[in-house]
Amino acid sequence: MIWMFKRIDHVGIAVKNLEEAIKIWEGLGFKVEEIEEVPDQKVKVAVIKVGENRIELLEATTEDSPIAKFIEKRGEGIHHLAIRVENIESKLEELKQKGYKLIDEKPRVGAGGAKIAFIHPKSVTGVLLELCERKE
């Protein structure tokens, strides 16, 4: 079964220092709408709205967080691409049936209370892809 994505939800950008990153992005003319800590993911998130899309600046809150490990290995930069979907559970099941390598077989709670799940980059041409279901 082929399913449609709703749209790009956000681009996640890993940063070493959230305050410094906010100054840079605000200097470009963007406005941070909210800052939130997601303890379960060991990350602090600054949300910049760009039309219907978002940029999320991601700062690690612990040395063992996925963002800290990413920065240590690759440096600051684009961490993931998030796609807005409906019924994330069925999307994950479909991808699993098709043989995609899933980091999350079941959704978890992300920033803003969204249901999220990641697909492994080895299954998606080297891109960490996040599926994201939000209440409209």
Curated annotation (Swiss-Prot):
InterPro entries: Glyas_Bleomycin-R_OHBP_Dase, MeMalonyl-CoA_epimerase, MMCE/EMCE_epimerase, VOC. GO terms for molecular function: metal ion binding; methylmalonyl-CoA epimerase activity. SUPFAM superfamilies: Glyoxalase/Bleomycin resistance protein/Dihydroxybiphenyl dioxygenase. GO terms for biological process: L-methylmalonyl-CoA metabolic process. It is an enzyme of class 5 (isomerase). It catalyses: (R)-methylmalonyl-CoA = (S)-methylmalonyl-CoA. Keywords: Cobalt, Isomerase, Metal-binding. PROSITE patterns: VOC. Pfam families: Glyoxalase_4 (PF13669). The keyword Isomerase applies. Highly thermostable: is fully active after 60 minutes at 100 degrees Celsius and loses less than 10 per cent of its activity after 100 minutes at the same temperature. Co(2+) binds at residues 10, 80, 130. Disulfide bonds: none annotated. Its EC number is 5.1.99.1. Residues 7-134 form the VOC domain. The keyword Isomerase applies. Belongs to the methylmalonyl-CoA epimerase family. This is Methylmalonyl-CoA epimerase. The lineage of its organism: Archaea, Methanobacteriati, Methanobacteriota, Thermococci, Thermococcales.
